[in-house]
UniProtKB/Swiss-Prot annotation:
Alphabetized SUPFAM superfamilies for the sequence: Cyclin-like
Coiled-coil regions listed in the entry: none
Gene behind the chain: ccnb2
Name of the protein described by the UniProt record: G2/mitotic-specific cyclin-B2
Gene Ontology molecular-function annotations: cyclin-dependent protein serine/threonine kinase regulator activity
Domain of life: Eukaryota
Length: 386
């Protein structure tokens, strides 16, 4: 046989593999299919290692046989795995659907701020998540003055005086909140005598001014405001003690930061915002509220404000952004209501905050009739009789 005839036969065999006598082209095709469909395992179970008969001439009756063998194996494999994957898929779909429904009910309050870079709409959610973490890292313990020479009444007297000093110096709102935060954080780790309490107070305000204000009052001004009870050197020395005790960590979030965010989320007007500020400032004098986080105080103040002015409940959107449900805020709202009743009924001498918010500049918000309503009184009474 010539080499030309050999090549011709090879070409013919390549074009018509079934015409070859020993089925050489059929076996690899079946072996590959067997690897995918576990036909090898079935063949081993039946005791068949390979084809026992020579493949006969291809006919119409023989063509469907491989299909009949392969199809049941594929269907059986799918059917066997279907019960395992069906339940997780259904459960996952239900969870996704429920989560989507919750998200659809929550309004994206930052959606309209994309063209205003100063509002940081892309990062504002992350910023407030960080503030929530930060306030937990710098807590104030409940009843931290237990066993101290300084009492809660002395603390209230000092804070009431600091509110007046703050107004006298015309300082930023943040400065007052930071002053009280520094005061409480310092006193819980460094007890002082009654004689030095006022020194700690004015020094805390000096530190807060340096942190918040553009133009800080001089040390001599703080010495003068104490009627020269403390010298400039004493104030500077106490400043060093406070900063070392706090490890120079002054960036504790303030209730005012969270209130501004909560007001935006609620779409509250100026009256609701101002009333919430008044309610928050009353809490500065309350020793029994020092352990509440700033975000909790802000949320509770706005929740009570919108309840008194418009009778509005705490919405799902407010719950989502504040991370607090209304049920969680109710105990804090009772404390706030108690403080309102105390100043309205003249059961306390510390009235600097009420006088401050009775000015026309602050809408005379402390004089509105809603603060004398039965709702406020009922909340205050429920604090002692839950």
């Amino acid at each position: 046989m010539s080499s030309v005839e050999v090549v011709a036969q090879q070409l013919l065999a390549a074009e018509h593999p079934r015409r070859m006598g020993k089925g050489a082209a059929a076996d690899p095709r079946r072996a590959a299919l067997g690897e995918l469909t576990n036909l090898n395992a079935v063949a081993a179970t039946n005791g068949k290692v390979g084809p026992s008969k020579k493949p006969s001439k291809a006919s119409c009756a023989q063509k469907p046989k491989p299909t009949e063998l392969v199809a049941p194996m594929i269907q059986t494999g799918a059917a066997a795995s279907a019960p395992v994957s069906a339940k997780p898929c259904v459960k996952e779909e239900q969870l996704c659907q429920a989560f989507s429904e919750v998200l659809l009910a929550v309004q994206d309050v930052d959606e309209q701020d994309a063209d205003q870079p100063q509002l940081c709409s892309q990062y504002v959610k992350d910023i407030y998540k960080y503030l929530h973490v930060l306030e937990e890292q710098q807590p104030v313990r409940a009843n931290y003055m237990q066993g101290y020479e300084v009492t809660e009444r002395m603390r209230a007297l000092l804070v009431d005086w600091l509110v007046q000093v703050h107004s006298r110096f015309q300082l930023l709102q943040e400065t007052l909140y930071l002053t009280v935060a520094i005061l409480d954080r310092f006193l819980q780790v460094h007890p002082v005598s009654r004689r030095k309490l006022q020194l700690v107070g004015v020094t805390a305000m000096l530190v807060a001014c340096k942190y918040e204000e553009m133009y800080t009052p001089e040390v001599a001004d703080f010495s003068y405001i104490t009627d020269n009870a403390f010298t400039k050197s004493q104030i500077v020395e106490m400043e060093q003690v406070i900063l070392r005790s706090l490890s120079f960590q002054l960036g504790r979030p303030l209730p005012l930061h969270f209130l501004r965010r909560a007001t935006k989320v609620a779409g509250a007007d100026v009256e609701k915002h101002t009333l919430a500020k008044y309610l928050m400032e009353l809490t500065l004098l309350d020793y029994h509220m020092v352990h509440y986080r700033p975000s909790e105080v802000a949320a509770a103040a706005l929740c009570l404000s919108q309840l008194l002015l418009d009778g509005l409940p705490w919405s799902l959107t407010q719950q989502q952004y504040s991370t607090y449900e209304e049920q969680h805020l109710k105990p804090i709202m009772r404390h706030i209501a108690k403080n309102v009743v105390l100043v309205n009924e003249g059961r306390t001498k510390f009235l600097a905050v009420k006088k401050k918010y009775s000015s026309s500049k602050l809408m005379k918000i402390s004089l509105i009739p809603q603060l004398n309503s039965s709702t406020v009184k009922a909340m205050a009474e429920s604090l002692h009789n839950p």
